[in-house]
């Protein structure tokens, strides 16, 4: 009997050929009148497609189907994918049969949890395995829940709350898919109190490149269990569900205020100082946002937010560290305080499909003498960029780490950036894409990043895999995303997927 490794290696040539052909057609076209379809350069007969469809208990969507127009879309409108075939599996068997079909026909497969990849990685011209139908959230007892990879965060938060008043540290955008955020790490507004999303995962079910389904846990394939907690999605197999240990629901108190953009430098220095000194308790995650261009208030303002599970009086006292006598006075008449129903109730979140480019940086600490210089450099050059017009805008977001995130050692999960103090996200949005708008957007975000990243990387470099960046070179992104953990990720990849069937733009390489 041929083993898994032999089977994968014997089919590697077909996949390589399919990958070479996948760029032939940017948009899948149907051959006229000959009973065949062109799938990413591979000609497949109607009979073959029909037989495949009959074997899938879920849904198969082809370009000729009415559902295709919406099903093909991803969140980032910078990408306009036209996959050859979209499969929404309903079972492990559906996934295994889809893998088999893609292999035999030389079609590249990508996995989509929620479609929020910053670089459009869940689109393409081949097969999209859309996990949105595998979205159940089921209580297992004692605060344990089984969460389907395709469950959107709005459902996750709602179902956990309704089944015993539980929650989980997770993201703020309610349309993100759980499978993607959990495998990349999982930032959120409860992270300092309860850790990353992946820190609550106790086991997962994964369909491998040979079609077999395995458990990943401390007692069953511990290396795979380690890898899917921070290694990113789409590298090792198709995660069907995760068993997670929830935490008791706590009210999330949100306190938002504004500072004039003229004090942006002092505002960021204050956040860095409070974070480095440990004065921000782990019950609080703080954010600082600079919006410029069309999204900015007039006059432009910095947005500061505290996300707190502390008591109302404690939250007020923490806020005074920022705006009190030893802080910076807030802009009068702006800002508000409220209790959020869930961490997905984000006052700054853009939930509709958007055109944007994004970048990230993990800040391990800035030398005090350098902090002001770094801030002034990009403040002066970028927060008043004349190229940002009425149709586009930029945003720089700082979020505090530490707390429970840092309780786990960098090598204990694949998420390596445990000792980072701050996570920085750079976003350039377009309301209406145009060649001029794209140029302006790229000029701003790439220039801003060039100003900032080389300086902060002196104190510890890194980027976040779930904020993937297609400007990074093949020689750069593995080290920036995973650092010293990358060799172990590669070893796990070579063992489970030696032919690199699950190959994406920035997936772990063999």
For each feature predicted by the language model, list its residue ranges.
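Soluble FAD-dependent oxygen oxidases
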Residues: 2-510
């Amino acid at each position: 009997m041929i083993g898994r490794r032999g089977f994968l290696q014997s089919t590697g040539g077909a996949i390589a050929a399919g990958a070479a052909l996948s760029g032939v057609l940017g948009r899948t076209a149907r051959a006229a009148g000959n009973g065949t379809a062109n799938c990413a350069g591979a000609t497949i007969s109607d009979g073959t497609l029909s037989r495949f469809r009959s074997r899938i208990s879920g849904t198969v969507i082809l370009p000729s189907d009415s559902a295709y127009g919406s099903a093909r879309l991803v969140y980032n409108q910078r990408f306009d994918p036209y996959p050859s075939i979209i499969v929404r599996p309903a079972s492990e068997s559906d996934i295994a049969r889809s893998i088999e079909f893609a292999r035999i026909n030389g079609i590249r497969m990508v996995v989509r949890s929620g479609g929020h990849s910053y670089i459009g990685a869940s689109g393409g011209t081949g097969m999209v395995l859309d996990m949105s139908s595998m979205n159940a959230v089921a209580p297992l007892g004692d605060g344990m829940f089984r969460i389907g990879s395709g469950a959107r965060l709005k459902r996750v938060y709602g179902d956990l709350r309704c089944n015993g008043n539980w929650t989980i540290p997770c993201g703020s955008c309610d349309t993100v898919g759980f499978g993607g955020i959990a495998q990349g790490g999982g930032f959120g507004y409860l992270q300092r109190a309860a850790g990353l999303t992946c820190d609550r995962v106790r086991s997962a079910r994964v369909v491998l490149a040979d079609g077999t389904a395995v458990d990943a846990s401390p007692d069953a394939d511990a290396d795979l269990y380690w890898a899917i907690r921070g290694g990113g999605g789409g590298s090792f197999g198709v995660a069907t569900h995760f068993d997670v240990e929830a935490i008791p629901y706590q009210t999330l108190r949100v306190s938002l205020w504004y500072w004039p953009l003229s004090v942006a430098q002092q505002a960021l220095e204050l956040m860095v100082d409070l974070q480095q000194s440990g004065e921000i308790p782990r019950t609080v995650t703080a954010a600082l946002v600079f919006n410029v261009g069309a999204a900015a208030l007039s006059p432009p303002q910095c947005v500061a937010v505290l996300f707190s599970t502390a008591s109302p009086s404690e939250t007020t006292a923490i806020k005074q560290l920022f705006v009190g006598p030893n802080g910076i006075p807030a802009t009068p008449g702006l800002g508000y305080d409220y209790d959020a129903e869930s961490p997905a109730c984000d006052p700054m979140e853009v939930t509709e499909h958007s055109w944007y480019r994004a970048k990230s940086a993990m800040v391990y600490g800035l030398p005090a003498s350098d902090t002001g210089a770094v801030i002034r450099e990009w403040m002066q050059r970028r927060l008043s960029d004349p190229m940002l017009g009425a149709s586009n805008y930029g945003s720089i977001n700082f979020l505090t780490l530490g707390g429970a995130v840092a309780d786990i050692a960098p090598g204990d999960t694949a998420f390596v950036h445990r000792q980072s103090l701050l996570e920085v996200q750079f976003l350039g949005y377009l309301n209406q894409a145009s060649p001029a708008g794209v140029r302006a957007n790229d000029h701003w975000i790439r220039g801003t990043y060039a100003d900032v990243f080389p300086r902060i990387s002196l104190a510890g470099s890194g980027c976040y895999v779930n904020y993937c960046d297609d400007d990074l070179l093949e020689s750069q992104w593995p080290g920036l995303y995973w650092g010293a953990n990358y060799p172990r990720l590669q070893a796990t990849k070579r063992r489970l997927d030696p032919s690199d069937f699950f190959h994406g733009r920035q997936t772990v390489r063999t």
